[in-house]
Amino acid sequence: MNSVPLLQRRVQLALGEYPVDAAFSPDGATVVVAGGEGGVFRVSLRAAGKAERIGEHSGGALALAWQPAGALFASSGQDGAVRLWDSRNTDSRVIHTHREWTEHLSFSGNGKLLAVGNATRLHIFDSAGAEQTLIAGHAGNIAALAWRPKSTEVAAACNGGVRVHRIATPVVSHSYDWKGACLTASWRPDGSVLASGLQDGTVHFWNIVTGKQSEMKGYGAKVAHTGWSANGKYLATAADRGIIVWEFAGRGPEGSEPIQLNGHTDRITQMICAPKGPYLASAGRDCRLLLWRPGFADEPVDADLFSDEIVLLHFSADGKTLLAGDRDGNLTVMVVGVS
């Protein structure tokens, strides 16, 4: 008999602010949450899930990133500031300020570099908070950042394509050009393929190894979410209320039929693949949180826990814990398992 995926509620609490972003500690025992009114909150899952406000950004907090295998995490906000925090004592310091909102943060896989997206500029800091380089000239505001696995290359999605920068001395940059506004940047786990969802309702792929590029059309709305399965076999994409999964086996997506995952009755607001394990989670304005296993014949598991629009989803590094937040500021932490 095939195992059946399960979602079990572990902790539920009221944050008191609209949840904008979140990040788990490497061991999954702590989660930090950015609030729309500026709060930075820490939730210990070993202490009954109490939310502790440890600091703030004026105007609103916008992004969080936790150092892989480390104790540091970064936050940014509408005040243009980037704060570097030590989770062992909640001390923080400002390592960067900008006159515009700072919306994008991402640590490299080895935790030694932090990428910061400010409008059209990309700043790179080391883990001590010292700025290493500034890369300007992106066409339009940076919409997403993603580090190539096991490398010092970071992709920045913007208008007209995705720019990939190898952080070295000097910085080596390459433009993967495509007309239109790129909204996402997602690396296949082996680093061989870069995918981006576009405003015009297409998905574009660049094979970094062969140089080949391809495009998938047919979406009825902008492709706002993309993500790879942990084994690199599937790329999930979401537009409007539907999810389309492309299989990257054999000849790649051109030689396979797309898998359509239909379960939402309103626009999908969040979609995320588990870093480990076969799971894909999606949530939407229909107040539904669905757990899928692309490539399996299961129907999705409906968490059936929410009465408001879900605006935040985040997996722990081991893929065993899932955090969801709704627009009223309620947080739910769930354990992902099988029966």
Segments (PLM) and residue ranges:
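WD40-repeat beta-propeller superdomains and closely related acidic/aromatic-rich repeat-like regions
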Residues: 1-339
